[in-house]
Amino acid sequence: MDHPNREKDERQRTTKGMPGRSGHGSRPSSSASSGVLMVGPNFRVGKKIGCGNFGELRLGKNLYTNEYVAIKLEPIKSRAPQLHLEYRFYKQLGSAAEGLPQVYYFGPCGKYNAMVLELLGPSLEDLFDLCDRTFTLKTVLMIAIQLISRMEYVHSKNLIYRDVKPENFLIGRQGNKKDHVIHIIDFGLAKEYIDPETKKHIPYREHKSLTGTARYMSINTHLGKEQSRRDDLEALGHMFMYFLRGSLPWQGLKADTLKERYQKIGDTKRNTPVEVLCENFPEEMATYLRYVRRLDFFERPDYDYLRTIFTELFEKKGYTFDYAYDWVGRPIPTPVGSVHVDSGTSAITRDSHVHRDRPSQQALRNQASSDRRGEWEIQPSRQTNTSYLTSHLAADRHGGSVQVVSSTNGELNVDDPTGAHSNAPITAQAEVEVVEEAKCCCFFKRKRKKTAQRHK
């Protein structure tokens, strides 16, 4: 009964222009009689791989190229829409720079706005779990050198990021030539620090509401000061120490209210000397943090100096920048199983450094990983074809950190790794639930309707 309609839809799709990239002005998505949900003329919507208060993250497929993509869906009537702003920032950043995902399309999808992005690999938080929640110095330095460059590029486009956390930095898909590159994603909380009209730096202000992730945000952000370039770099420094130490001194603090908890995190951060935070690690880690914390609000950071701190330490240790991260040789979690990263295929060896084994972290890692990943568990390594899927959860997970957002800056994302078929309804937002420390304070409950719905 549906064959004529399906054939008509296929003919319509094949008569369109460029196969890969659809512009903002392309026709709205359609749902064929078969129940297939489309975003624009090219992209078929698949199962849900993440959700949060922004809407949902779905797996998608480009019907022209047969490539998998990630599709972010946000209700058009969202209380604090951010998807179009994020799309605008991606366009402002451009697609030529290394370590930024390709953006293929933005447009309506029924009652939702949709943004189609390149599907990347797992986040640094996923990989941190995989490596028993500690990274070696070599891996952290290779990450740090790349992320200083990513942040320099973002800042060069007159944007500050304001959302540093391991979940927002992803490696490329395994088997892809960019699988070793650390990507930066999710610009929903970004802000222009250069006024587009006056071309001047935004003014210094105080009494600002918190924006970002409390675990990593700068001390000045806790104090209510307007963020600038210095704050992105300080947050990176906190994340680097998180990777080296396995945790930060201000994690796990108890308080009666969220406001009190944020206050305690900020107080502990201020009262922890850099020397104590970086104790038992190379002095260069402390040098980095001291420098970024002393920057003036308007000051342009010396990115070359910061990179040099870490590159010289890297060379002093005798490391080779071969991208032999700690996760190389381990099975990488994907939506359909796992992919074993074979270091032999890329001539990368792990002999240049020894992974620090911390058995005491194992039970904690297993529990935390199972709580957060759900069905995204690592299965025994097996052969897969070149079209295997990798996780794209970094924009939608919190990794145990308390997350805060200004009401004027959009909404935050959290992962619900429950798979869904392409004809499953995209559920609306429900109530906010405050959960324990291991979760996010902005977690949104989802109730799936029993009866299937179609977008008209």
UniProtKB/Swiss-Prot annotation:
Gene3D superfamilies: Phosphorylase Kinase, domain 1, Transferase(Phosphotransferase) domain 1. Residues 1-13, 350-359 have a biased composition (Basic and acidic residues). Residues 1-35, 349-382 are annotated as: Disordered. GO terms for cellular component: cytoplasm; nucleus; plasma membrane. It is found in: Cytoplasm. Its EC number is 2.7.11.1. PROSITE patterns: PROTEIN_KINASE_ATP, PROTEIN_KINASE_DOM, PROTEIN_KINASE_ST. Coiled coil: none annotated. InterPro entries: Casein_kinase-1_gamma_C, CK1_Ser-Thr_kinase, Kinase-like_dom_sf, Prot_kinase_dom, Protein_kinase_ATP_BS, Ser/Thr_kinase_AS. Belongs to the protein kinase superfamily. CK1 Ser/Thr protein kinase family. Casein kinase I subfamily. PANTHER family: CASEIN KINASE-RELATED. This is Casein kinase I isoform gamma-1. It comes from Gallus gallus (Chicken).
